[in-house]
Amino acid sequence: MKPKLKAIIIGAGGVTSYMLPALKNSFDLSLTIFDGDRLEKHNLDRQLFRNNQVGEYKARALMKLYNFRKDEGTAVSEYFTTDILDTEYKFFFSDCDVIISCVDNHPA
């Protein structure tokens, strides 16, 4: 039996696309991913997405790619800012075990 883990990942690009299979295989995972970016064709050479996912929000595309059921995870197609802590998404943070930052630029 795998240990339970409630995780939040901020950023759904290359690092997350490679890390997510290991997390899913290691834990009984409850996951929330925040990312407002859409997948672009130029992302495909360094991120584990499929051609038919171009144009989708990256957070949603990753949930589909790794077969997360609705009860296992949530994809939030918005950029994470501290303002999110004052929105309807704040409950995700109340009892999470770990927050993982996988952002790909300094402003993020």
Could you describe each region identified by the protein language model?
Residues 1-108:
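Adenine nucleotide-associated cytosolic modules
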